[in-house]
Amino acid sequence: MHNIPPEESLIEYPSDFPIKVMGKQHPEFAQTLTEVVLQFDPAFDPASVEMRPSKGGNYMGLTFTVRATSREQLDSLYRALHGHPMVSIVL
């Protein structure tokens, strides 16, 4: 990620912020990544995860709408998700 000074951030904190994650279909994909999200947003409601399987059923897309409290929190969450072995893409 680029180092943008906080005063130039386009996001106002706190705010609800959607994060989309894609990976190969796996029975524990949603649960495993929900646990990662909860490390950065303990108030996150796991029931709010939006799940969309790919047409072929080989991949799963998840949307987590987290309560973003700082740029550092979002950057750390993105790094944790991006580095997870089950994750192909984070948007």
Swiss-Prot record:
Transmembrane segments: none annotated. Pfam families: DUF493 (PF04359). It comes from the Bacteria. PANTHER family: UPF0250 PROTEIN YBED. HAMAP family: UPF0250. Belongs to the UPF0250 family. This is UPF0250 protein BPP0168.
